[in-house]
Amino acid sequence: MKPSMRAKLDHLDTRLAELNSLLTSEEATKDMDAYRKLTREHSDIATVVEQFYLYKQAEADAQAAEEMRKDPEMKEFADEEQKQALATMEALESTLQKLLLPKDENDERNVFLEIRAGTGGDEGALFAGDLLRMYTRFAERQGWKVEVVSAAESDLGGYKEVVLRLVGQAVYSRLKFESGGHRVQRVPQTETQGRIHTSACTVAVMPETDELEAVKINPAELRIDTFRASGAGGQHINKTDSAIRITHLPTGTVVECQDDRSQHRNREQAMKVLVSRIMDAREREKHQLEAQTRKSLVGTGDRSDRIRTYNFPQGRITDHRINLTLYKIDAMMDGDIDDLCNALASEHQAELLAALGDN
């Protein structure tokens, strides 16, 4: 084990003892917010330290076996004991490396997922509808709740833009690598000559913030407009100005919400999306600065990056960041994207491990 890694583990061991003392003190529960933070930290560290204790026990066993090997009568037995102890140490070191990886504080959050049609006109909008179905079906498979925040439909039944709110367990951790450019190659329904067209959409996955206070927004910097909701019709459509459009003047960020009949709830939801977009822009700026010092294949989330191609004639989906091609496009467009999400998460973990090894 590298000295730097051992030093981190020794520090966590010391910190766990401090937390045990703090949590059992009479003062601990006087500030419940602070108490909850301490219990979360204790839970995170205890798992690591428990594995570190097992590692040190295996290390002691290996050293004891080395001493035992000096006795000729015990050498064969000692060799086997030492072999087992070293194998245990190797496995535990690998586990500890992963446990020490920096955690993304957003991993457990719900998300706003935004799909925008790019190049390709009507075909791009139809593909946006296909991506909407793919992510909706994937969310249903995970047991997540799906809410449509806003949707701008195209003439042929696709979407110029659609924003979803996905609520469930660890939503962001599963979908955070979906941000970027998605390209489709196929024969459009409107194509009479059978020619393959290329269209594109942009996907943005933004973690939902816990509190609006996470981003300080001056109300004077907001322009709030109300308008009549548009939709498929019905007795409740276009009767009141319940839809909300909020413009953040300093950044030019615009958010619309018309999913609810209540103007108050639409405004509340629009503010959540606005805060998430502003936070997302700041995170992307930070990641771009980090990328200048460390090349990351998976985790940049740059909207201008073409991350994936969906080739329908060949029945394949290719993720260009990890050079992975899967020939099951029909199943994947129906929400079966677990293999892709797992591969991207594994690549990201490998990058983090490599960075940890460099330190």
Swiss-Prot record:
Methylated by PrmC. Methylation increases the termination efficiency of RF1. The modification N5-methylglutamine is found at Q235. InterPro entries: PCRF, Pep_chain_release_fac_I, Pep_chain_release_fac_I_sf, Prokaryotic/Mito_RF, RF-1. GO terms for molecular function: translation release factor activity, codon specific. Keywords: Cytoplasm, Methylation, Protein biosynthesis. It holds the Pfam family RF-1. GO terms for cellular component: cytoplasm. It is found in: Cytoplasm. Its main location: cytoplasm. HAMAP family: Rel_fac_1 (MF_00093). This is Peptide chain release factor 1. The gene is prfA.
